[in-house]
């Protein structure tokens, strides 16, 4: 069946080449037109399904507590005398607290408040927060911390002292060193964070002339959005740069521009059609899908290079190009089909992961591989068959020149292949032992792998985002956020149930029914306040003594239930928050925590003496309720609802972390789990995590588990395919040998050198599987074919280290060196992909050429019997 299909395709390609050109051009133009619809997505939230429990809860928490994604603008004041070491000199350093510095901060704050997309009422800065003090008559006093920029040092010192008295601001809004201040900028849409950050940078650049101030902007939203902007630019640079490098390398090998144009057309058409289809079908371009072009480029030219290599060797002047190319493609069809199917299977296995962007990446790369195979099978024969005799003559003069005039590249390639041949055929036993040792060490290295990621680390160390992240996390408690949400899950009796169960005299039955109707009215709402008002109204009526007493008892029980239902106004429960914070304050990974207890302590202090001795929690529910009621008379009453819900049954503890590494967040989660294991929450209280730092841990855990399942599944699928396609169990095992060694070595090296296992590295396993098996299939298929012709094992290997080994080496070099431009990328994931792509290609080719001959010789009784 395959023979008939390939014959028809080759007839169409060589006889109706213009049809092939027209069809390919139409597909490319149509898909290229779809790219105008591109949407960039760098939100790590989308690494989880929209209905994933952790993501749903995180978004519920943001809505419930009015928490918004925020940009952090930080400013650091250079010390007045960097070389000063004596105490007197240091004491004169006011740091950020000078009139000029505070005026600059106020100016930037006012600009931020007027920036489109900023939630102005929630901006936190010296200019927008309250100073909580005790008035002259002992009353609680709320005044703006910095209603206007100070004009004297005395006023600046007052602000410094005021902030030092407010633990909720110290370490968050101002550093304990007095050298830095922060502005927290909540935004309506995290996708606007880069634009807002750029507006702020532009204002600072144009309006702040104070050279002693260093301004920084960071935060996960701006890091993610800025990565998206730079990723878009990188997409436009990396793929063409890689294509250019591949083009140059192909010319070095084939010395014919006309000939090597063909594989480049295949690669570019594959990339454009695949990316156009992805965008046209409505998928966003995530960090992974942005690399589709980079991954497809090498795979798309692999088959073309094999065809060109064999065509160049077979074609002689005077022969018909269409006949030669037909023979070549028929000869290579089976190994090319096998490699395409197995490579596609490797990437399709990524669809088994629970990470949507990785699923999309795997689906489109797998489809792109099959598309490249189809284009290669039709376009390359059409192209070569239409080459002019003059162009083919030039090809021959370049490739079949006399040995004395051979090009340097041929000499180097032949020397390399000859060296590999010598090693492979003369040191079989030593090679097998060496690779066994390397594999054993690599397995140990795999167990040393540290799973970790951090979107900020996607930038190079000298990038402004990384510089800002390092500087601000050194000065402040932390720019990374996580939330512990504690909730009372006990079901409360409704107001209607309380009324129904109340012991009332029969004379109040009619009143009870009327009140129940009111409570059941959807407009009135079923709540205790409505019931309390109804009882109050009834008490003012003309009542008998038993009616009056019964209603009074009901009102008392309502008041009692209202008090006890407000879980986080109960002293023990608020103390629970304080105890948790005290524990976390002893952990180096946690910079600072804030909760409802901090609000209560500050207000309680100022309601009493104003001294630190009264910075404590009241010991009764009414006293706590009073402090919270007083706080709501501040300029920012909405801040209370960032920490507790209006019914006081759900509360939030805000953790500030100085590290956004998933590894560190995982350790914090374990610390809290251990704490609650030793300090059990009261019955009915439960806790859950939310926040960006936590979500990153969740999706990475999913990714690791998913990638392991994907890799194992793909390995089994490819092995079964190899056995079926090669029709031999022993050849199936041999085909998997280079793949297994390469994957083991690559990931072992990652563990040994201490490179974090992150998202780009995780998906490279699929590429390793696809490309490693490619070389092995070509080697085994050609070895079987040559053995059938020669009947001699030694002659088979001698022939294998001629054109087949040269083709494998040429392919490996083209792909490995073709991606060196990625090493110059400003974004770390692209650098990672470049390094590992090159390593995978080099190692898999080397293992194929060294290990397979040794293994085949060792097992020759079975291998060549089946051949």
Residue positions per predicted region:
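Transmembrane alpha-helices and their membrane-interface boundaries in multi-pass membrane transporters
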Residues: 22, 280, 297-309, 333-352, ...
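Alpha-helical transmembrane helix bundles of large polytopic membrane transport and channel proteins
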Residues: 83-92, 100-174, 188, 193-196, ...
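Extracytoplasmic
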Residues: 149-256, 570-579, 583-589, 593, ...
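Interfacial segments of transmembrane alpha-helices in multi-pass membrane proteins
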Residues: 232-285, 352-356, 708-754, 758, ...
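Juxtamembrane segments of multi-pass membrane proteins
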Residues: 419-618
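Pore- and gate-forming transmembrane helices of large, multi-pass membrane proteins
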Residues: 235-237, 264, 316-353, 707, ...
């Amino acid at each position: 069946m395959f023979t008939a299909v390939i014959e028809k395709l080759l007839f169409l390609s060589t006889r109706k080449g213009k049809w092939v050109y027209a069809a390919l051009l139409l597909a490319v133009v149509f898909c290229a037109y779809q790219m105008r619809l591109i949407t960039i997505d760098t939100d790590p939230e989308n690494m989880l399904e929209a209905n994933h429990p952790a993501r749903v809860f995180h978004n519920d928490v943001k809505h419930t507590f009015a928490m918004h994604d925020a940009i952090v603008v930080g400013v650091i004041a250079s010390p007045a005398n960097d070389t000063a070491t004596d105490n007197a000199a240091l004491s004169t350093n006011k740091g950020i607290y000078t009139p000029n510095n505070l005026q600059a901060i106020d100016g930037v704050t006012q600009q931020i408040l007027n920036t489109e997309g900023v939630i102005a009422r929630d901006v936190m800065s010296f200019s927008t927060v309250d100073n909580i003090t005790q008035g002259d008559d002992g009353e609680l006093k709320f005044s703006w911390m910095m209603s206007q920029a100070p004009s004297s040092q005395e006023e600046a010192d007052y602000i410094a002292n005021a902030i030092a008295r407010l633990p909720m601001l110290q370490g968050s809004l101002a550093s304990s060193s007095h050298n830095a201040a922060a502005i927290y900028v909540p935004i309506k849409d995290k996708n606007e964070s880069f634009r807002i950050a750029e507006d702020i940078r532009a204002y600072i650049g144009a309006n702040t002339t104070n050279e002693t101030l260093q301004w920084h902007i960071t935060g996960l939203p701006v890091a993610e959005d800025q990565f998206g902007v730079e990723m878009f630019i990188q997409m436009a640079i990396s793929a063409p740069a890689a294509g250019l490098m591949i083009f140059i390398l192909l010319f070095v090998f084939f010395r014919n521009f006309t000939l090597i144009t063909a594989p480049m057309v295949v690669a570019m058409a594959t990339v454009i059609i695949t990316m156009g289809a992805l965008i046209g079908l409505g998928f966003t371009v995530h960090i992974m899908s942005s690399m589709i072009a980079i991954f497809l480029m090498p795979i798309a030219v692999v088959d073309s290079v094999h065809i060109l290599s064999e065509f160049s060797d077979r074609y002689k002047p005077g022969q018909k190009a269409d006949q030669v190319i037909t023979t070549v493609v028929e000869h290579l069809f089976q190994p090319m089909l096998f490699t395409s199917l197995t490579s596609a299977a490797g990437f399709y296995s990524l669809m088994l992961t629970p990470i949507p962007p990785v699923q999309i990446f795997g689906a489109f790369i797998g489809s792109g591989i099959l598309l490249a195979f189809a284009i290669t099978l039709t376009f390359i024969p059409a192209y070569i068959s239409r080459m002019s005799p003059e162009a083919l003559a030039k090809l021959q003069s370049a490739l079949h020149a006399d040995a004395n005039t051979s090009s340097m590249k041929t000499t180097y390639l032949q020397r390399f292949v000859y060296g590999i041949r010598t090693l492979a055929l003369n040191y079989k036993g030593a090679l097998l032992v060496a690779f066994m040792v390397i594999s054993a060490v690599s397995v140990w290295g795999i167990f040393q792998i540290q799973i970790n990621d951090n979107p900020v680390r996607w930038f190079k160390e000298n990038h402004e985002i990384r510089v800002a992240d390092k500087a601000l996390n050194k000065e402040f408690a932390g720019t990374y956020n996580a939330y512990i949400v504690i909730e009372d899950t006990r079901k409360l009796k409704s107001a209607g149930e309380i009324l129904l169960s109340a012991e009332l005299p029969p004379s109040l039955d009619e009143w009870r029914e009327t009140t129940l109707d009111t409570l059941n009215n959807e407009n009135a709402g079923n709540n205790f306040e409505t019931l309390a008002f109804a009882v109050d109204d009834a008490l003012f009526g003309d009542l008998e003594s038993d009616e009056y007493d019964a209603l009074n008892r009901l009102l008392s029980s309502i008041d009692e239930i209202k008090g006890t239902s407000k879980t986080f106004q109960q002293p023990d429960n608020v103390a629970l928050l304080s105890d948790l914070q005290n524990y976390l304050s002893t952990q180096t990974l946690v910079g600072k925590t804030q909760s409802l207890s901090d609000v209560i302590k500050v207000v309680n202090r100022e309601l009493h003496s104003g001294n630190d001795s009264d910075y404590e929690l009241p010991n009764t529910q009414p006293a706590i309720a009073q402090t919270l009621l007083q706080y709501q008379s501040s300029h920012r009453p909405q801040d209370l609802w960032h920490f507790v819900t209006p019914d006081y049954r759900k509360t939030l503890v805000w953790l500030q972390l100085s590290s956004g590494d998933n590894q560190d967040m995982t350790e914090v989660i374990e610390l809290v789990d251990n704490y609650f294991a030793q300090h059990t929450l009261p019955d009915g209280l439960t806790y859950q995590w939310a926040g960006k730092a936590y979500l990153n841990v969740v999706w990475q855990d999913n990714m690791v588990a998913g990638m392991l399942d994907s890799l194992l599944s793909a390995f089994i699928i490819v092995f079964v395919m190899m056995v079926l396609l090669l029709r031999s169990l022993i050849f199936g095992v041999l085909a998997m040998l280079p793949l297994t060694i390469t994957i083991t070595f690559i990931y072992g090296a990652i563990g040994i050198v201490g490179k974090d296992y992150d998202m780009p590295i995780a998906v490279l396993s699929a590429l390793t599987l696809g490309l490693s098996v490619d070389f092995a299939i070509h080697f085994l298929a050609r070895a079987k074919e040559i053995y059938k012709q020669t009947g001699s094992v030694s002659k088979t290997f001698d022939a294998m280290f001629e054109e087949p080994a040269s083709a494998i080496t040429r392919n490996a070099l083209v792909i490995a060196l073709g991606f060196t431009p990625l090493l110059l990328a400003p974004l770390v994931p692209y650098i990672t992909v470049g390094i590992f792509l090159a390593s995978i290609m080099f190692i898999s080719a080397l293992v194929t050429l060294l290990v397979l001959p040794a293994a085949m010789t060792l097992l020759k009784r079975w291998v060549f019997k089946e051949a």
